[in-house]
């Protein structure tokens, strides 16, 4: 119990900041979410560079969706480059299921499903509003996708 109290206090102290924030989740202690140890992302830090890294299936896309949805809910404009089409689902409200309900109950965070305001932009002739860019701004991967190049 003392370990739990010390852990929660350490996380709480580390994620305390002035101003508004986004809740990303709760810290885990021995695989158990600690409802009192919320992981908070201060809005004032969102003008810096960031990295979301991990192996396949570890929640990188979901983390980015949560950040983008919460920023939209707070009135902050978001521009996401979605080459794989994984993020467009934030336009519609999600559907709950027992796994989501169980996770939110364990975190002590209510599940609220809302669609976000989305405008689709495009660099190609696909559907969406044309996004202007110069060729020099493209990296090699994006440039090859725009030109529909293959490995040969």
What feature does the model see in each segment?
Residues 105-152:
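Helical/strand "switch-coupling" subdomains that flank nucleotide/phosphate-binding cores, especially
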């Amino acid at each position: 119990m003392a370990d739990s109290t010390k852990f929660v206090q350490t996380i709480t102290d580390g994620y305390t900041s002035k101003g508004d924030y986004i809740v990303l989740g709760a810290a885990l202690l021995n695989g158990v979410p600690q409802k009192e140890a919320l992981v908070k992302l201060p809005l004032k830090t969102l003008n810096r560079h960031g990295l979301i890294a991990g192996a396949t299936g570890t929640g990188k896309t979901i983390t980015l969706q949560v950040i983008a949805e919460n920023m939209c809910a707070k009135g902050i404009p978001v521009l996401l480059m979605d080459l794989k089409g994984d993020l467009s689902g934030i336009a519609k409200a999600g559907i709950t299921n027992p796994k989501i309900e169980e996770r939110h109950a364990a975190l002590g965070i209510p599940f609220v499903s809302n669609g976000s305001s989305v405008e689709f932009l495009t660099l190609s002739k696909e559907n969406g509003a044309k996004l202007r860019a110069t060729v020099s701004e493209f990296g090699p991967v994006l440039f090859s996708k725009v030109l529909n190049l293959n490995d040969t």
